[in-house]
Amino acid sequence: FVPEWNAENCIQCNKCAYVCPHASIRPFVLDAEEQKGAKFEQLKAVGKVFDGMTFRIQVDVLDCLGCGNCADICPGNPKKGGKALTMKHLESQLAEADNWTYCAENVKSKQHLVDIKANVKNSQFATPLFEFSGACSGCGETPYVKLISQLYGDREMVANATGCSSIYSGSVPSTPYTTNAKGHGPAWANSLFEDFCEFGLGMELANEKMRARICLLYTS
């Protein structure tokens, strides 16, 4: 089962994306140019900063693990009386794969238009730099990891403690950590069974040393 979006009941709160363990459901805001090629339902985006733009919750049905967290958290529209997300058989939602591809490849992030640290809704307009991990369906850790990557991922350094996070973050040959449009993203390393706090301190000291060396080269 995967979630199906009912635009009529959506209040654009973005809570569904906030709780998703795998970043497989996201809000997209489309400008006039991006709307031209979109062949799916959209809503008028709420907020003055999104004037003339449209809003859509898009599910990546091929990466969704069907935990149902998004449908559970969805408050729906009190005036309409129903949730905006309901779980449906995957076979009935396969057409959404093309819609996801369009959004992912053609719709640019609008996070620069809002303060992504102001509230839950705004935070989810930021592109996740942690996505499609090998974590279990409904994982309670990865939504936090994903959120940190949205807020600080372009300059994030992770000293990972051994546990579930070392498995879903570093399963060769892939990694759930990714980069933004500028090529910036988290730096991740795992110390296995060592003291990860000390390991992280070493990363910080090394970073400071490299920055100091760059400054020295520029001034000498």
Stretches with model-predicted labels:
Residues K88-S92, A161-S169:
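A glycine-rich phosphate-binding loop feature that marks nucleotide/adenosyl-phosphate handling sites
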Residues K110, I116-P143:
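An acidic-aromatic substrate-binding cleft motif
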Residues E34-K36, S92-L94, W100-A104, V172-A181:
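Short secondary-structure boundary/capping segments
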Residues G134-T162, G170:
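N-terminal amphipathic, basic-rich helices that act as targeting or association modules
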Residues Y218-T219:
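Conserved small/polar residues in nucleotide/adenosyl-binding loops
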